[in-house]
Regions:
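Glycine/small-residue-rich loop that forms an oxyanion/phosphate-binding "nest" at active or ligand-binding sites
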Residues: 74-95
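Generic beta-sheet signal
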Residues: 63-65, 96, 109, 179
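Short, Asp-centered acidic motifs that coordinate Mg2+ and/or phosphate
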Residues: 3, 32-33, 91, 175-177
């Protein structure tokens, strides 16, 4: 199987000409599918989303990135992407779920950080340096009462990890493609 692998396109930061060139390249790619590991553009930029989705000529399997949710909440961003998957025949949003395509099990999850890179415990959300990370000022929490915190990311990470471990174990004898942000 031939796949076009995309990640962190950040279409919000490109000119119309640059985006047009990219969308043309995606449309003309001689591949069986597109695997996109998130951050195409912010979900509140409907024009870029429509252009991205209209460029698809083969199935696209997509997991959400953190920047997709900038200006909204993780929940609202997921709902937006689920809606787009219903509207666009080539767009498949993988949100801790999987699908089978051409004999491959494509398993998708955002798998955000758990802040435990060195295995020395959980980072406190009150630590000043984490407030400097843009996510914690631009992504609302799901209750819309403030911004997402490191603890929210840790919870999302744990949910994703549990799903991924279970699903990969269930399909260990098959061809598995793991798609995460």
């Amino acid at each position: 199987m031939k796949a076009l692998i995309l990640s962190d396109l950040h279409l919000d930061h490109w000119s119309k000409t640059q985006n047009s060139t990219l969308f043309n390249d995606i449309s003309n790619a001689q591949v069986d599918c597109v695997l996109c590991a998130g951050d195409a553009c912010q979900v509140n930029n409907s024009q870029n989303w429509e252009l991205f989705l209209s460029s698809l000529r083969v199935p696209c399997f997509y997991v959400m990135g953190n920047h997709d949710a900038y200006g909204t909440s993780m929940l609202q961003a997921r709902e937006f992407l689920h809606d787009k998957a219903q509207q666009c025949k080539y767009f498949n949003f993988l949100d801790n779920n999987h699908t089978i395509f051409n004999g491959y099990v494509i398993v998708g999850s955002p798998l955000y950080t758990n802040f435990n890179l060195f295995g020395n415990g959980v980072v406190e959300s009150t630590h000043p340096r984490y407030k400097m990370i843009n996510d914690f000022g631009y992504i609302h929490n799901d209750q819309e009462s403030g911004c997402i915190t490191p603890h929210d990311y840790i919870s999302l990470h744990n949910q994703a990890r549990e799903y991924l471990t279970k699903t990969i174990t269930e399909h260990k004898d098959g061809k598995v493609i793991l798609l995460t942000h």
